[in-house]
Amino acid sequence: MTNTEINTKTSEFKIIENQKDEPDLKQAQKFVGGMVQGIEFPNGDYMIMNEEGKLMQLPLNPEATALWRATFTKDKYLFGYDDFVVGPAILIKKQALKRWA
């Protein structure tokens, strides 16, 4: 498998499916444009985004937000279900995690 990139007008969303494509810290910082924030999903996948993206008023990332809201639903979580992702984001699939695990 190879990594999949989805480009939008507002931001980028990259899905990493292979360990050889997993970014290191510097690569992740460059992609998201600053300090990184990592969130582990219940299924073991890991999302990396810009920690200060909302403060920087980065544009909404619709693909990452849709994935977030499909995962963290109101019926299962007390908080975070209505949150959103801004700026570039990387989703590292569970089988591709090495450095970030």
What is each stretch, according to the model?
Residues 1-101:
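Short beta-rich binding modules
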